[in-house]
């Protein structure tokens, strides 16, 4: 039996493991699955003690100002959340190697790559956000209280979350060509994938609203989410670094760098397009 706060929900949620379910069913003299599977109107009463603690969390932001006097006011954002689940009741630490040390470390590598060269025309912002696991809180605060100078405009977000597992030659991309938020940003991402020998897949739209890029998209900012998919260690203490495919994570990082570099030099910032099923078959 475990209790979860339900992310940003204020309603505690109870999850019953099979063993707990069977014990409750046995108390009700229901001894087989066929019996308790047919019962209607069985009511259970639970007393739950919830201790809430409010803490301060911080976004970490770094900005490389663009070299063009006008285009420098157009900002390409790289985002990744650095928070995870902390310490469990049993004292085990949820290190979150894939979720999301993989994405947050990729941002550090991308920042170093940009720093090694001359600044591109548009500005580059590296955004490590907190509070993702509690309901995308850090990214929501950032887009609602944009701390940049007033003249600077966010024109794209490239979000990396869980990029180090599953198929070594594929990376999930959302929004897909059939999604209402499909944009020229996604087309450029497909080209970057080809340059790095990765196949983009478009079967992860169900996760579009579950990561930080969604808060940018809600503000009308073209956004893309690079995501290798969930696995058996998702939100478990077993999500450790020895299971990361570092070669794949590095390739996805290079895809993201190429994409941002292209956007920073493009004549026009990315724009949303109508869903295009033909592009999805590329």
Regions found by a protein language model. Name each.
Residues 87-94, 168-171, 236-239:
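Short acidic, glycine/proline-rich loop/turn micro-motifs
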Residues 97-110:
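Active-site alpha-helical elements of protease catalytic centers
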Residues 2-96, 112, 116, 121, ...:
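Soluble metallo-hydrolase cores and metallopeptidase-like ectodomains found primarily
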Residues 2-4, 9-29, 119, 129-231:
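Metal-dependent peptidase/peptidase-like ectodomains
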């Amino acid at each position: 039996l475990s209790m979860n706060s339900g992310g940003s929900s204020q309603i505690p949620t109870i999850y019953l493991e099979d063993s707990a379910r069977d014990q409750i069913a046995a108390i009700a003299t229901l001894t087989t699955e066929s019996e308790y599977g047919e019962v209607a109107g069985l009511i259970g009463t639970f007393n739950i003690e919830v201790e809430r603690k409010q803490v301060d969390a911080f976004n970490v932001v770094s900005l490389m100002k663009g070299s063009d006097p006008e285009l420098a006011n157009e900002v390409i954002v790289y985002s990744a959340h650095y928070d995870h689940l902390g310490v469990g009741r049993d004292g085990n630490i949820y290190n979150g190697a894939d979720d999301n040390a993989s994405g947050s470390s990729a941002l550090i590598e991308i920042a170093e790559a940009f720093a090694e060269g001359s600044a591109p025309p548009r500005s580059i912002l590296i955004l490590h956000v907190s509070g993702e696991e509690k309901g995308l809180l850090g990214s929501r605060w950032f887009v609602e209280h944009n701390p940049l100078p007033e003249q600077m405009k966010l024109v794209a977000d490239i979000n990396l979350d869980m990029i180090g597992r599953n198929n070594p030659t594929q990376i999930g991309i959302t929004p897909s060509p059939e999604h209402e938020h499909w944009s020229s940003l996604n087309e450029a991402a497909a080209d970057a994938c080809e340059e790095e020998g990765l196949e983009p897949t478009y079967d992860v739209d169900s996760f579009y609203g579950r990561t930080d890029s969604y808060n940018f998209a809600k503000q009308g900012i073209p956004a893309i989410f690079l995501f290798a998919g969930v696995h058996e260690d998702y939100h478990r203490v077993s999500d450790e670094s020895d299971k990361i495919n570092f070669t794949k994570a590095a390739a996805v990082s290079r895809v993201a760098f190429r994409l941002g570099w292209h956007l920073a030099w493009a004549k026009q910032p990315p724009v949303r397009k109508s869903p295009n099923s033909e592009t999805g078959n590329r």
